[in-house]
Design a protein with these regions (language model features):
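Short, charged recognition helix plus adjacent turn
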Residues: 6-9, 14-15, 34, 41, ...
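Short, basic-rich loop-to-helix N-cap that marks the start of a DNA-contacting helix
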Residues: 39-50
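Absolute protein N-terminus
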Residues: 1-3
Length: 72
């Protein structure tokens, strides 16, 4: 499960919207919303990598956002 609050916070820090980010990583906006809300498939490794690059996330930030349930 994605830590939605942290992801949204990073998106806002970069002065982007979810629509902007989804377009940059080539994911349909509705699909992106479903994935962050846990409705259906999770993000693929390729998608996590693309998001991390667009938002300039550190490894620790990416882990906290995308893998927090596995680490905690």
């Amino acid at each position: 499960m994605v830590n939605v609050d942290k992801l949204r916070g990073k998106i806002v820090e970069k002065r982007m919207s979810i629509a902007d980010l989804s377009k940059k990583i080539d994911i349909d906006k509705a699909t992106f919303y479903r994935k962050i809300n846990g409705e259906g498939e999770t993000f693929s490794i390729r998608e996590v990598d693309a998001i991390a690059k667009e938002l300039n996330l550190t490894i620790d930030e990416a882990i906290a956002i995308f893998f927090s349930q596995f680490v905690a």
